[in-house]
């Protein structure tokens, strides 16, 4: 496979709100993709079920993951916040319960 520096950076924005039961599988799927030049932006929208802590744990394991914690503002605000920090040439959204 090509060096990731020659491939375009893809930003993946994942809104997260109380999805602890699904989040690990979602993040394993994203992190396990064969395309490696990814920026994974997790927007924790004030989760109270441990989802935010799980986001932090994954960020410690994988340097491509950025976590933003905020008070609950809704999925549209999460997506907009992710767009504001995304640096990729290409962009995608993944729902955390996918």
Please give the residue ranges for each predicted region.
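N-proximal low-complexity "stem/linker" segments adjacent to membrane-targeting elements
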Residues: 1-32
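The conserved acidic donor/metal-binding loop of glycosyltransferases
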Residues: 95-98
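Glycine-rich, basic loop-to-helix element that forms the pyrophosphate-binding segment
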Residues: 70-86
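Local beta-strand N-terminus motif with an aromatic residue
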Residues: 9-10, 38, 88
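Short aromatic/hydrophobic "clamp" motif used to bind/position activated sugar donors
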Residues: 91
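Acidic donor-binding segment of Leloir-type glycosyltransferases
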Residues: 27-69
